[in-house]
Design a protein with these regions (language model features):
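Short cysteine-rich clusters marking metal-coordination/redox-active sites
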Residues: 3-6, 17-20
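Short Cys/His-rich micro-motifs in 6-15 aa windows
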Residues: 21-31
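Charged, solvent-exposed faces of alpha-helical coiled-coils
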Residues: 58-61, 65-68, 72, 88-92, ...
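Long amphipathic alpha-helical coiled-coil segments
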Residues: 111-133
């Protein structure tokens, strides 16, 4: 088995590389290219196995959803005096916002572990530059 880090030939039974001691059986993340919001509900182990590009796209989706939940929550909280909003609606809006905040923090934590920082803004320009680097 050839080490994907240093290129050293190892026996097929080896767990780690004899030269650099990198794990040989660990698969590198592959670019998925199709991400949707519901993937953020998957467990940490699944999210950590995603490609960095896919995580950035997913983080962008989660941040957008979190923003819309925040605006909904604020609209419900600041309802005019004549409008009575049931408490369960308020609680639902707040819980949705907290839920997407927690999911956002999980993805940001994985990105910090990989990149050393979390991007403040994930726009098309950032994703295009990263995609170009991946393809070359």
């Amino acid at each position: 088995m050839i080490c994907s880090y240093c290129g050293q030939e190892n026996s097929s039974y080896a767990e780690t590389c004899s030269f650099c001691e990198a794990p040989l059986k660990v698969k590198r993340p592959k670019l998925n290219g199709f991400m949707y919001l519901e993937l953020c509900e998957r467990p940490f182990s699944f999210l950590a196995s995603l490609h960095t590009y896919d995580l950035l796209v997913l983080l962008r989706l989660v941040r957008e959803k979190r923003t819309s939940c925040y605006h909904l929550m604020r609209t419900v909280q600041k309802a005019p005096d004549g409008v009575v909003v049931p408490n369960d609606i308020k609680a639902l809006a707040e819980s949705e916002y907290r839920l997407y905040t927690a999911r956002m923090k999980v993805i940001e934590g994985i990105l910090i572990d990989r990149m050393g920082y979390k991007p403040k803004r994930i726009d098309d320009k950032l994703l295009e530059r990263l995609k170009e680097k991946i393809e070359t």
